[in-house]
């Protein structure tokens, strides 16, 4: 599953999006679908290099 992550400029929040977000000092998409995630999870993601596409894989526990 591919998602996008992006960091806000002003409050340093990190968001996960199902589609590519747009920028106006903060990140949004046309349906405003976003999930705020722990801002310490991806320290390499900055406002300047946002958004970045990532792939999430579900791990099945046995």
Where are these regions (language model features)?
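Intrinsic low-complexity, intrinsically disordered segments enriched in polar/basic residues
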Residues: 1, 15-17, 62
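Generic structural signal for short, solvent-exposed loop/turn connectors between secondary structure elements
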Residues: 1-2, 32
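N-terminal acidic leader/helix
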Residues: 2-14
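Short, surface-exposed terminal/edge motifs of secreted or surface/virion proteins that either
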Residues: 12-23
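Low-complexity intrinsically disordered segments
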Residues: 21-62
């Amino acid at each position: 599953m591919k998602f996008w992550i992006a960091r806000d400029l002003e409050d340093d929040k990190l968001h996960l999006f199902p589609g590519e977000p747009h920028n106006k000092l903060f990140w949004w998409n046309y349906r405003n679908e976003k999930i705020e995630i722990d801002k310490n999870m991806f320290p390499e993601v900055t406002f300047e290099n946002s958004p970045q596409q990532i792939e999430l894989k579900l791990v099945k526990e046995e």
